[in-house]
Amino acid sequence: MTTQLATDTELSAVNSILGSIGQSPITQLNLTNLQNPEIALVHNILMEVTKDVQNEGWHFNQEEHIARQPDASGHFTIPSNYLRFDVHDGLYDRTRDVVKRNGKLYDKVTHTDVFSGELYFDITYLFDFEDIPSAIQRYIIARSSVRAATQVVSNQELVQLLQLEEAKTLASAVEYDCEQGDHSFFGFPHESNYRSYQPYKALIR
């Protein structure tokens, strides 16, 4: 009988973390009734690391130049799944300097949270674990395993071994992010086009 491979779920991630610290796997993850304190701790670690990693900002959870309208009272209420919410081109346009205050966007230049019209934003989103790309999932699991080994087992040798795995998965995650983002050191912004010099084209006459 062959084993079918699939991307990670919260259950498989928790089991991977449990396995890394020498604990038995579980068959289901009942989030409304986690009676085992160790399982609850491991799941909490997974959720914390998921937020921490996404807070770093990756190609998969960042979007630029998103148009948003204020509500009827002129406020931009920040949704709970927004990790970062900043005005587009803020590096060049210093007429606005926005921060989160009382759950809404606040302009430190004009000293108000009331806006008169549409603005464009750069947004970093918070996704559920199962909506995260596999390469980033594996990094989250490895990083969570290190934290679990530190908090639950307190075995320094195990922590060091797991840190090696964390470094490998981080390298894979960064490689994935670079390939998906098509990043360039020239710093060309989104919605622009640039074709670099390609030597083979000199042969096309």
Model-based region annotation:
Residues 1-205:
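Glycine-enriched, solvent-exposed interface loops adjoining structured elements
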